[in-house]
Amino acid sequence: DFRPDYLFLGTVVKKLGTPLVLALTATATKEVEADICRILFSDRKIDKVRCSVDRPNIFLDIEEVENDAQKDELLIGLVEKMRGPGLIYFSSKKKADETSRMLGRKTGLRVAAYHAGMLFDERYSVLQQFLHGELDVVCATSAFGMGINKPDIRYVIHYHIPLDLENYVQEFGRCSRDGKQGRIFRKRERPIFAYL
């Protein structure tokens, strides 16, 4: 159900004469992987390669906060302290907008929001500014993710925790793809055991 149009890829591959196909994913569950294999490679032998998602260069940090005011205070401190580009993930478009304005005012950093409620041109502009080092921080919903590869993102903060482990891993996977040190912050809001 992630990308319904992908269900038609098997038909397209057959219409093209069954050329060689390479399917890659960083976050597919075993069930989704089985669906991909069934749809794309139903009548062919395939080779699967799996790699670890372990990223020893990324430090996961949990900060305990009591309320939203304390969370915002902590957020300001983290953003001021961290070096390099950063992402802050939200489950609310409104909160992403509000926090981007607040961080810009209180830190003097170059901050913008990114979410599906924005016009395409606005989102594209924010993405290009971030990729070219013209923004320090992006306050985003999960709309900021797929296909975005900025190797030097040094930290990811989860203001709100994603609903499932797959999205959590995908979002913090944006951090430090160049192999240098990175940090992931989240507040103690929901026990990590909820994902197990």
Task: Label every PLM stretch briefly.
Residues D1-L196:
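Helicase motor core with emphasis on the C-terminal RecA-like subdomain
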